[in-house]
From Swiss-Prot:
Keyword terms: Amino-acid transport, Cell inner membrane, Cell membrane, Ion transport, Membrane, Sodium, Sodium transport, Symport, Transmembrane, Transmembrane helix, Transport
CDD domains for this protein: SLC5sbd_PutP
TM spans (from-to): 6-26, 42-62, 68-88, 127-147, 163-183, 192-212, 235-255, 276-296, 320-340, 371-391, 398-418, 430-450, 452-472
PROSITE patterns (UniProt xref): NA_SOLUT_SYMP_1, NA_SOLUT_SYMP_2, NA_SOLUT_SYMP_3
Lineage, uppermost ranks: Bacteria, Pseudomonadati, Pseudomonadota, Gammaproteobacteria, Enterobacterales
Annotated function: Catalyzes the sodium-dependent uptake of extracellular L-proline.
BP-aspect Gene Ontology terms: cellular response to proline; proline transport; transmembrane transport
Site-annotated residues for Involved in high-affinity binding for sodium and proline: 344
Protein name (database record): Sodium/proline symporter
Recorded catalytic activity of this chain's protein: L-proline(in) + Na(+)(in) = L-proline(out) + Na(+)(out)
One protein family per Pfam: SSF
GO molecular function (one): proline:sodium symporter activity
InterPro entries (alphabetical): Na/Glc_symporter_sf, Na/Pro_symporter, Na/solute_symporter, Na/solute_symporter_CS, Sodium:Solute_Symporter
GO cellular component: plasma membrane
């Protein structure tokens, strides 16, 4: 399609704004702690929106509305599962992880935290977890770059090769320059843009059809199954869709936001903000797909692109219902969703290399400035590898991204959850949980037993592995138990205000 000047200008202004934030963050980045975790200085608002934006990729504005448009409201079970999982993660893990990482050598990364928490002198936990992060997040990054390239390709009529670099360049620049603060501040802007788009668009769709009741009648007339929450689903299918929520406990880029909060007491505010944002965004995405059924049913002449690819429902509605300036802002929300997740994943990969491999094994005495620049170079290296993988969007390696959410959820999720909740957990328990969870996901996905989403057995067996191997081996050292007790007491300490952190 021919790109309009207003849309092009809007995209360029947005991208320039993100890069400008990167330069502002650069001025506040004094050491490696600042570059990787923002000096643990994020307030509740930035913590909340950064966690949300880093979580919700382009799937929120393309995949979810497309699935609802194609199959009806029954596809919303995954949104319900994600909402529940995110809330439990905020409630049980967020504040505790913020405290425990600080009490365990001020850990900057998950591998660093595992090493300190379980006094792993062999550093096996650090190596395994860092390599798992590098493998899957590099592929994750490649997948995000493909999504950004597809957006530029379809919106601006670019070749895929040009779109590949155009889509990735801005994210790489502001992440390279500003590190964690740039990523978190841009996430906040991007999250605001996403919620604006997902509230405004379905409202205008409903108005365009003739109101809520009229829209619902049109949807029912097309197929009554569109409003059936149980359409084509059995108990296992519903549990599998809901099971996506288990992934939150083990996603390094989301957990990093908890670790970067200025205090565990501010987590309660952040939870309320983040969950409100998430519920509104998911409801908006579902509404875009759901009421899009009514709009395109009433306007079949406009439905060609959507009928060919249901994931374009948000894009087409934005271009049809709004003038090019507003449409440009709304379509920037898709780019925001892609960029916010990609930048977080690039930074997690960079920190895994710099903190958990370079500093831990090669340069223990490296200066803060050296680590910051190594971190920046690693952002660039990982990005270039991801771009190389994304150069062929049909690359089989990209298929491994389907393992990533379940893999992280099952391998890291139980370990993180038990590590902040159970003082009796040991290094062998952590290692067993990580390996059993990951292997279960891989094997279960290959054989597809019971048609059950592999994260569920992976999480269950990983948890059992933690408990069994922790109880079979030696008890944690006195120092480990004392450190856990101090961290737990600090977590439950009274906040400065009357608001309780629990």
């Amino acid at each position: 399609m021919a790109i309009s000047t207003p849309m092009l200008v809007t995209f360029c202004v947005y991208i320039f704004g993100m890069i400008l934030i990167g330069f502002i963050a650069w001025r506040s980045t004094k050491n490696f702690d600042d570059y990787i975790l923002g000096g643990r200085s994020l307030g509740p608002f930035v913590t909340a929106l950064s966690a949300g934006a880093s979580d919700m990729s382009g799937w929120l504005l393309m995949g979810l509305p497309g699935a609802i448009f194609l199959s009806g409201i029954s596809e919303s079970w995954i949104a319900i599962g994600l909402t529940l999982g995110a809330w439990i993660n905020w409630k049980l893990v967020a504040g505790r992880l913020r405290v425990h990482t600080e009490f365990n050598n001020n850990a900057l990364t998950l591998p660093d935290y595992f090493t300190g928490r379980f006094e792993d002198k062999s550093r096996v936990l650090r190596i395994i977890s860092a390599l798992v992060i590098l493998l899957f997040f590099t592929i994750y990054c490649a997948s995000g770059i493909v999504a950004g390239a597809r957006l530029f390709e379809s919106t601006f009529g670019m070749s895929y090769e040009t779109a590949l670099w155009a889509g990735a360049a801005a994210t790489i620049i502001y992440t390279f320059i500003g590190g964690f603060l740039a990523v978190s501040w841009t996430d906040t802007v991007q999250a605001s843009l996403m919620i604006f788009a997902l509230i405004l668009t379905p409202v205008m769709v409903i108005v365009g059809v003739g109101g809520f009741s009229e829209s619902l009648e049109v949807i029912k007339q097309k197929s009554i199954e569109n409003v059936d929450m149980l359409k084509g689903l059995n108990f296992v299918a519903i549990i599998s869709l809901m099971g996506w929520g288990l992934g939150y406990f083990g996603q390094p880029h989301i957990l990093a936001r908890f670790m970067a909060a200025d205090s565990h007491h501010s987590i309660v505010h952040a939870r309320r903000i983040s969950m409100t944002w998430m519920i509104l965004c998911l409801a908006g995405a579902v509404a875009v797909g759901f009421f899009g059924i009514a709009y395109f049913n009433n306007n079949p002449a406009l439905a060609g692109a959507v009928n060919q690819n249901s994931e374009r429902v948000f894009i087409e509605l934005a271009q049809i219902l709004f003038n090019p300036w507003i449409a440009g802002v709304l379509l920037s929300a898709i780019l925001a969703a892609v960029m916010s997740t990609l930048s977080c994943q690039l930074l997690v990969c960079s920190s895994a290399i710099t903190e958990d491999l370079y500093k831990a094994f090669l340069r223990k005495s490296a200066s803060q400035q050296e680590l910051v620049w190594v971190g920046r170079v690693m952002v660039l290296v990982v990005a270039l590898i991801a771009i190389a993988l994304a150069a062929n969007p049909d690359n089989r390696v990209l298929g491994l991204v389907s393992y990533a959410w379940a893999g992280f959820g099952a391998a890291f999720g139980p370990v993180v959850l038990f590590s902040v909740m159970w003082s009796r957990m040991t290094r062998n328990g952590a290692l067993a949980g990580m390996i059993i969870g990951a292997v279960t996901v891989i094997v279960w996905k290959q054989y597809g037993w019971l048609d059950l989403y592999e994260i569920i057995p992976g999480f269950i067996f990983g948890s059992l592995g933690i408990v069994i191997f922790s109880l079979l081996g030696k008890a944690p050292t006195a120092a480990m138990q004392e450190r856990f007790a101090k961290a737990d007491a600090h977590y439950h300490s009274a906040p400065p205000s009357k608001l309780q952190a629990e």
